[in-house]
Structure formats: structure tokens, C-alpha cells
């Protein structure tokens, strides 16, 4: 299956970021002041004054391959991540990723290889349960899982950390899988009703 992402929820907006920045003077928003929000956000982003962008959050549910999983785990500041654990449960769905830019014969080869590993995973897990107990069986049988195996992760960014994630992962030099994930996340944020982060995204050149 393909990697997938869902936007579960969000908090904040361009106004949230602007009011946070203006707390040092006055949070009251006049009509004239409201009109200056795009300019303010652009200045904050370009000058590196990014603390106000920490006041909003974006909450995603993703299903990704192990390589993309590792890319996500490298983002620790302003990011909260929980994920499926093969140590605590048997991964019965056998989700796995096949690169869609490969020749068909290689896609089929990886599909077959991964399916063999998944079958052995379940077989060995059940056998080890008899000799080593369920806990040890789950945490060690997973060594049969391939790098293409997918897990589901609950990921929440504040907007500052999301912008940093996009800078690194929505880049031509990033691995295809994580670049596509970042692009889909960005698309979902842009499609939010009312476009609440329109000027913040423009401030960061998205």
C-alpha cells in the first residue's frame, strides 16, 4: 500500500501568531493592525523570530514505511510522536510499502520477498510464544519484518517545528517517500476551511 496521511485536527491561525508576537506591546487587533498581519508574519519568519509560530499546532495520523518513520523520529523539538509497537502487539495487518517508481518486475519481487517475511513473522511468533512466552515472542519475531513494513504514527507539530520539517523534508534532496509525505501534509494544511494559516505559509515561502 502507499504511505498515507490524515490531518486529525489543528489549533491556531495567522491571527494566533500575530497576537503572540504583539503581546509585548498590545494584543488588541484594530482593523488597521489586522491588515498588517501578513507583513508582520513575513518579517518574523525572515528575521528568525519564530517563537510566535509555536503557539499553533497541527495533528496528523500517518502510515509510513520504516525509512520514513526514522526520518520523522529525527524531528524531536516541538514534535510529539506515538506509534504502533510490534513489541506490544502482533502486527496482524502486514502493511508494507512498494516504491511506485520501480519497474514492475522489481515491485513484484519486493512484494514476494516482503510477503515471505511477514508469513515467517507470524509463524515464528506463534512458535516462540510456546517456548519463550508471548512478550518475548512479540519483541523478537519482529526481526522478520522488512524495512518496507509500515506502521501507523500519531504526529503533532507546533507550526515552528512543522516549518522546519518542511524545510528539510519537502526539498528536492530529501528521499522521495518523506518528500511526498511532507508535500501531502502541506496540501492538507492549505486545504483547511478558511485557510487559517495562509499568510504564515506564505511567510515561510509555501
Language-model segments: residues:
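Family-specific signature for flavin-dependent thymidylate synthase
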Residues: 1-206
Amino acid at each position: 500500500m502507499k504511505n498515507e496521511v490524515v490531518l486529525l485536527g489543528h489549533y491556531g491561525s495567522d491571527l494566533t501568531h500575530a497576537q503572540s508576537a504583539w503581546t509585548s506591546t498590545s494584543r488588541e487587533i484594530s482593523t488597521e493592525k489586522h491588515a498588517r498581519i501578513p507583513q508582520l508574519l513575513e518579517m518574523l519568519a525572515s528575521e528568525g523570530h519564530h517563537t510566535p509560530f509555536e503557539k499553533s499546532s497541527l495533528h496528523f495520523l500517518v502510515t509510513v514505511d520504516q525509512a520514513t518513520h526514522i526520518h520523522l523520529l529525527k524531528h524531536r523539538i516541538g514534535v510529539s510522536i506515538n506509534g504502533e509497537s510490534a513489541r506490544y502487539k502482533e502486527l496482524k495487518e502486514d502493511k508494507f510499502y512498494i516504491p511506485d517508481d520501480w519497474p514492475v518486475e522489481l515491485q513484484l519481487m519486493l512484494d514476494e520477498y516482503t510477503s515471505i517475511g511477514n508469513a515467517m513473522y507470524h509463524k515464528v511468533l506463534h512458535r516462540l510464544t510456546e517456548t519463550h512466552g508471548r512478550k518475548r515472542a512479540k519483541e523478537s519475531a519482529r526481526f522478520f519484518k522488512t524495512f518496507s513494513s509500515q506502521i501507523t504514527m500519531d504526529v503533532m507539530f507546533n507550526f515552528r517545528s512543522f516549518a522546519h520539517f518542511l524545510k528539510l523534508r519537502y526539498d528536492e534532496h530529501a528521499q522521495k517517500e518523506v518528500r511526498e509525505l511532507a508535500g501531502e501534509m502541506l496540501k492538507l494544511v492549505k486545504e483547511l476551511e478558511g485557510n487559517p494559516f495562509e499568510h504564515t505559509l506564505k511567510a515561510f515561502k509555501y
